[in-house]
Amino acid sequence: MATVRICVCGDEGTGKSSLITSLVKGVFVTNKIQPVLPQITIPPTIGTPENVTTTTVVDTSALPQERSNLAREIRKSNVILLVYSDHYSYERVALFWLPYFRSLGVNVPVVLCANKSDLAADHTEAQVIEEEMLPVMAEFKEIDSCIRTSAREHRNVNEAFFLCQKAVTHPIAPLFDSKESALKPAAVAALQRIFYLSDKDRDGYLSDKEIEDFQMRCFDKPLSKEDLVHIKETIQKTHPDSVTPFGIDCRGFIHLNKMYAEKGRHETVWIILRAFQYTDNLSLQESFLHPRFEVPPFASAELSPEGYRFFVNLFLLSDKDNDGGLNDAELASLFAPTPGLPASWADGSFPSSTVRNEAGHVTLQGWLAQWSMTTFQSPKTTLEYLAYLGFESSDRSNPSTTAALKVTRPRKKRKRPGRVGRNVVLGHVLGAPGSGKSALLDAFLARGFSHTYRPTIQPRTAVNTVELPGGKQCYLILDELGELEPAILENQAKLLDQCDVIVYTYDSSDPDSFAYIPQLRSKYPHLEELPSVFIALKADLDRTTQRAEHQPHEYTAMLNMPSPPLHVSATWSSIQEVFVHIAEAAMEPSTAFPRSEEDVEGKWMAWGIALGAVVCAGAAAVMIWRRVSGSG
């Protein structure tokens, strides 16, 4: 909502105070009025732009002794009503007033007002505009609009102040470059995005149905067939190729809005921009890009069913060649209404972080996995891109982009039996250099095995779906920490909050590989508070004895782990079972912790109870048999 502060300037005797009085009283005041009126505040009335709360009108004096007060009021205003009434005061507009405003360093719109039109009956409206106003407007681009008024006849008085309000609420300067006679780049970019979002079938044209939907969204009233025909005819006069049987193309849409701006109908352009959440500086509203969304400790953010539907539909619309994958051109087109790929995607080497087909194009599975990971790691990023990409909530009680997300239940006591209430889980893959961590991530994404060793410096992430026993699916994120491993493992609070499982890996053919794991757990004892999975990689090679205090199976037995290390090779097809095991450990964390003495005692007690029940049942059967035999 805007508060408009109008500073009324001009030479003495041009009728500034009379204009203000006529506005307030509704009629011309014949009595002598004071030279400078006190400041007045006008509440919103019928005809006031809808986003104006209050309007303050400030009268000023042009006398030299009042120059400091004049400068102060000009600097406080957000629009200037510059009044002239005769040839002399008109000449002073270009010679003194407009250069004076510039000298003060103010950057506010100016409404040029030719007052006392009742005294210039020999000049028509068109003559005044063409001979007086247009030359000045051409020289001084800060002039937003012009109007001819008469305070005595109460002619165009309200309209003059309405133009001032509109100059603040619907400024022309951010939209149109009068010197170049073209829309400014930021305005073109905003309108291109609006066209893209309104083109629901992504065929490059706004069909009649899409134009009607656009009309209702922006103006909340239907478009008549006559108006639609007129719009098309208007575009065809300049760009005949922009109107086709399929509809209006983007060039025609931009040209139509340029014409609105050129002809003083920039209010129409602003209505369109604001319907799509644009601010006065042509950026998207902060509350729209970053709505309030909080994730409690030990909880996580995931896409809701509506969020998944949106990204599925976006994928299907963008896969123009219907090959089941998004190539570079299709991805570029999809992200056209955004600043580009999310920074986290670029840092994570997208698209190599997710599932691709044989041609290297991102599959639907990979697309959804990538957004699931993004939402888990940075829900604010997902919300921002949902806004850029045009997500519209179907939930009237929550029209925000937050309808596409949900928050999982906090998981605090991981050792308590049961599944966690989430569908996206994160595992850190740890191990000595050369243990096979990168090959494990490649196998997770069904990539071919590479015999070339490349040490991981930058963190690397892979995300994919895993089907659990029973048919339920979850998204598993595996990351190799690279040089950031010490920093991530030292941050105990963040590690315990975000990580769901630790995957310890070692090269079963390298005698020095396993020793890294006990050293790591000793250095970061809080790792014991996370579910753990131990994996012996490179099982296709000859297994060797590890140069460690304890052999891997002895170490896991000493920890009372539920199972010894899993032996597997990235070259084996059975490696997919390892990812199911990791996902199960994350989804049911109690199964991946060392068994406590209570667990063992509980098992013996259960065996004892079961054995006792069997013995009692047997004794009872013998007693019954004897009674039956005795009675016989």
From Swiss-Prot:
Residues 625-632 are mitochondrial intermembrane. This is Mitochondrial Rho GTPase 1. Residues 408-418 have a biased composition (Basic residues). The gene is gem1. Residues 396-418 are annotated as: Disordered. Ca(2+) 2 binds at D319, D321, D323, E330. Ca(2+) 1 binds at D199, D201, D203, Y205, E210. Residues 1-603 are cytoplasmic.
